[in-house]
Amino acid sequence: MQNRLLLIGGGHSHVEVIRRFGLNPEPGIAVTLVSPDRHTAYSGMLPGYIAGHYRFEDCHIDLETLCRSAGVTRVAAAVTGIDLQRRIARCADGAEHAFDVVAIDSGSTPVIAGIPGAAQHGMPVKPVPAFLDYWTTLRAAARNAPSDLRIVIVGAGAGGVELTLAMHNRIRGDNGRAQFTVISDGPTLLAAHPAGVQRRFSAVLRERGITLRLNAPVQKATAESLVLGSGEVLRADHVIWVTGAAAPAWPRECGLLTDAAGFIVVNAHLQSPSHDCVFATGDIAAMTSAPRPKSGVYAVRQGPPLTENLRRALRGGTLLEYHPQRRALALISTGDRYAVASYGRLAFGGAWVWRWKDYIDTAFMQRYRVAETS
C-alpha cells in the first residue's frame, strides 16, 4: 500500500518539492497536488510582467506540465478544510482527498477584513490570476480614458511600491491616462527597509508624479472613494489593496494550531506542533521560533528542507531542523529596468542591479522550465 503525500497549494516551496520528487522519486509514495490554478506566478518577476518586461510564460510555472513530468497527480480544486482525525482534505467542489502526510503552501491574501466596503470595492493583488484579469481591464480603461484615471494603491511596503511603479511604467508606455496615489497608515514607505532605500523610492515616486500619502489609514471604501482616518474623502476610480498578509479561516477552524492572525504555527521542522502529519511553508505558515517577514524569498528557501522532511516523515525517519537566514537580500525594481538592493542597512541601485535581479529570477524559473520539458 502506498503512502499518500498531499500538497495543498502551488506555492514557491511546493514547486520545488514537485521538482525534487520528479528528479528522485520515492518508492511507495503517491504525491498529489491540489491547486485551483494551472499556472503559479513567481512573485519575484510579477512586477516585471506588469511593467511589460516579461511575457506571461516567463514568470509563470505550468503546474499541470510540471506535475506530469514529475509523476505527481494534479487536482484542479481549492481546499476549504481538513478533517485532521480522518486525514482527509475537503475541496470546494465537494471532493475529498485522503493523505498520510499533508503540506500546505497556499499563500495569503491582503488584509482588508477590518475595512468596511473593502471587499466590495477595489481589487486585492492576490489571488494573482484574478488580479491579472483586472489589470488587463484597467490597462484598456486607461488607454481609452478621456481624462486621468485616479488609481489608488493601499499599501506602501515593497509590494505596493513596486507594483505602483510597474503599473505606472506600463500605462505610460501604452499612452494611457492615469494619476497614481500610494497611501499607507504608517509614517514611512518601505518600513521594513533602511532609510537609504526609503529615500531612493520617495525620490522616484516624486520624479514620476506619483502622490505618496503617509499616516493615512483607510476607514471605509465606497464605489467612488476612500474615507481616511482624518475624515478626508479621497476620490478613486480604481483601488488596489496591497496591504499586509491575511490567512484563510479554514486552518484555524479545522483545529490546527495557529497564531493570533490565523497562520499555521510550525516548528523548526516546518511541521505543525499540534498535528505531526501536517507541514506548512510560505505565507500561510508562522515559524514562531524564528519569525520572518512574509516573503517569497523565504518560501523558496523552505523548498529543499521541506522536501527532505516530507520524505523522512513518510518513511518514519528523524526530521531535520531548518534555520532561516536572519536577513534576506531584497532587489526592488522601479518599474523601468532599474532596481535597488536592500540588505540590512545597505542600499545601492542601478541598471546593473536590475540585470542582476533578472539573472537570478530567470535562473530560478529555468529550473522548472527544464522539468516541464523533460
Regions found by a protein language model. Give the residues of each.
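Beta1-alpha1 glycine-rich phosphate/pyrophosphate-binding loop at the start
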Residues: 1-72, 162-193
